[in-house]
Amino acid sequence: MRMTTIGGAVTTLLLAMGALGALHGCATAPTDDAVAARAAASLKSSFAARGQAGLQRLDQDETQKLCSEYANRPLPASVAEKIQQANLATIRYPADGKLVGDWKNGEKIAQSGQGFQFSDDPKNPAGANCYACHQLSPQELSFGTIGPSLYRFGKLRGFTDETRKYAWGKVYNADAFSACSNMPRFGHSGILTEQQLRDVVALLVDPGSPVNQ
């Protein structure tokens, strides 16, 4: 008799759960677009403009939207190609054709993480903070590993015009060569000036740079 009571209770519970499941199945689930829109609105409402750090930084261009869309799933080859071609078209080379500056200044830029924060003076030049993600000069022992080592960048690739042009393009807009790269688009986004770009390229490709020793 006790076993019958328990069985009946379990049966009743299962039937109730089934009814709830049926009701849930009849409900209309929010679409991916609706969820994304709500998430974006929630994110935006949690920020406040402060100094030079304005809310316009939350606005995404087409590349950023695509990379966000595929953030947690494999990026299709066709989408990756679309992103790379679109960003390749944005790369601007100096009118005078000079791609290489002073590697000593490039080292300072690579070491500096200043710029674009609300507490930074917008009148001061921004840094690239390269060491946060890359190994460059062997004298610097503190470096990140999110990105590949750039030690001997020019020495391994050759001190050629092709290497210099590639280095400029990569620093200017990394998404042109690797879709959804973690690397900032230093030239495309206006983070570094043209001369700063030259100096960072020099750090990578100048035979006299410590990177190539």
Name each region found by the language model.
Residues M1-L13:
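Bacterial N-terminal signal peptides that target proteins for export
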Residues A34-A48, G101-N105, Y131-V205:
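Extracytoplasmic electron-transfer domains, predominantly the class I c-type cytochrome c fold
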Residues F116-S119, Q139-F143, P210:
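Secretory-pathway/luminal and periplasmic proteins that interact with or process carbohydrate-rich
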Residues L15, L20-F116, K170, L203-Q213:
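Post-cleavage N-terminal segment of exported redox proteins
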Residues P94-A95, S119, F186-S189:
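Generic anion/oxyanion-binding catalytic loop in active/binding sites
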Residues F118-N129:
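Local sequence-structure signature of Cys/Sec-based thiol-disulfide redox active-site neighborhoods
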